[in-house]
Design a protein with these regions (language model features):
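Active-site anion/phosphate-binding pocket segments in diverse small-molecule metabolic enzymes
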Residues: 4-171
Length: 171
């Protein structure tokens, strides 16, 4: 017996006549579809959180990141979080493109994204080491983060490393 499978998430939502023996839910399992009209009917279920591991005060002229990719134009507070391109937050999010949320406020990535960490400008955010950082979650969509770096949520979500601890919460 031949099993026919032709559709991914977008196909399932748009081409009901081609839903043969199987379909591939794919990215819709995360609550995304890469189609704004379809996304209205989906609920994102993924949250990616970490903590601030270090905060450093730097002075105007100091540098941050590989190859001194950020040279501070003013005094700044820089937070380091233990997430980097080895975990799926790739280098495209570096140098002010990507952002995460600290205390509900946007904190932009400064410098290059490193293997196991990245740095954030938290100059305007009252925070401390150990505070929670939301990379993706409620009010911090994968779509928005991906768009900030000119990519799509599918690339971000499927690129998350299996080394990230996962917890499934029912309900």
């Amino acid at each position: 017996m031949c099993i026919r499978d032709r559709l991914n998430t977008s196909g399932v939502m748009n081409y009901k006549n081609y839903q043969f023996d199987m379909v591939r839910a794919g990215i819709s399992l995360y609550g995304y579809s890469n189609d704004n009209e379809i996304d209205k009917f989906l609920k994102p279920v993924l949250t990616l959180k970490t903590i601030i591991s270090q905060i450093h005060k730097i002075k105007k002229g100091d540098s941050v990141g590989y190859n001194r990719s950020l040279i501070a134009k003013k005094n700044m507070s820089i937070a380091t979080i233990p997430v980097g391109h080895a975990y799926g937050i790739t280098r495209i999010y570096g140098n002010g493109k990507g952002y995460v949320y600290v205390k509900g406020k946007k904190a932009f990535v400064v410098g290059n994204v490193c293997m196991d960490m990245l740095m954030l400008d938290v100059s305007a955010i009252e925070c401390k080491e150990g505070d929670e950082v939301v990379v993706v979650g409620e009010n911090a969509s994968a779509e928005a983060l991906a768009n900030s770096a000119g990519t799509i949520s599918y690339e971000l979500l499927t690129g998350l490393s299996d080394t990230i601890t996962r917890r499934v919460i029912a309900g």
